[in-house]
Amino acid sequence: DSGVKGVNTLRAIYGTGEETGMEDMENYFKKNPLPDMAFTPDSDYGICFAEKGILQLEVSTLLNNATTLSQFHAGRAVNAVPDRAYVMLDSSDYDEQTLMRLADASDGDFEFNYTIDGLMIISRGKAAHACEPDKGYNAAAALVDLISNVYTTKETGSICSFIDYAINKETNGRSLGLKMSDAVSGSLTVNLSSVNIEGQTAKAVFDIRYPVTVSVNRVL
C-alpha cells in the first residue's frame, strides 16, 4: 500500500493450537520451510527473551483406596488454577461439625450440602494461569487441606494424602524439595491443576514451571 518494494518475502503465519500442543505449526512446517527470521506478537506484553521449562505430570494410583471419600473433582485445564472443586464424603455428625468449624476459620470459601450420597463440600477459589499460581486461589488445594485436617490417610486415600504432604497449598515446590530460582526467569512454580477421584479412578495433574537455566533432570 505504501509503495515499498522489498527483496525478501514477508509472511504472516497464523496458528490456533498454542494451548493444545501446537500441532498445527508442526504440520505447516512439514510442507513449508522454516523462516530465516520470525517474531510472535503476543497481546500487549513486553518482549520475551526466555521462557521457563514446563512439566505437566499426572500422579495416579492403580486402585482408589479411600474409605470415606467417594468423589473428588476439580479442574478442567492443566494450565490453569482450578476455581472450583467438590468432594463427597461418608461422614459422621461429629466430623461434619469439625469440618464446618475449620472451614469458618480458614481463608477458603466452602459450601456444605447434604445429599443421599453423603456430605458434599464445594470449594470456590480464584482462577489464574498456571505460570502464576500465586495470583489465584486454588480451590482443589484448599479442599484437600480442609479434609486432611479431619480425616486420616486411609480415609481420604493416597492421592489426597500425597497432595497434602507434598504440596498442600504451596506454589513454590518447597515441600517437594524443588524451591529454586534464577536471575533470568525467576522462581519455580507448582500448580495443582486437577483432581479426579471416583470409583476406581484416582489421579491428580500438576503443572510445574521451572527456571530456564535449570535442567529438567534436576526437577525430575
PLM features: what roles do these ranges have?
Residues Q56, L62-L220:
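Metal-dependent amide/peptide-bond hydrolase catalytic core
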Residues D1-N64, M100, D104, N172-S187:
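Acidic/histidine-rich catalytic neighborhood of metal-dependent amide-processing enzymes
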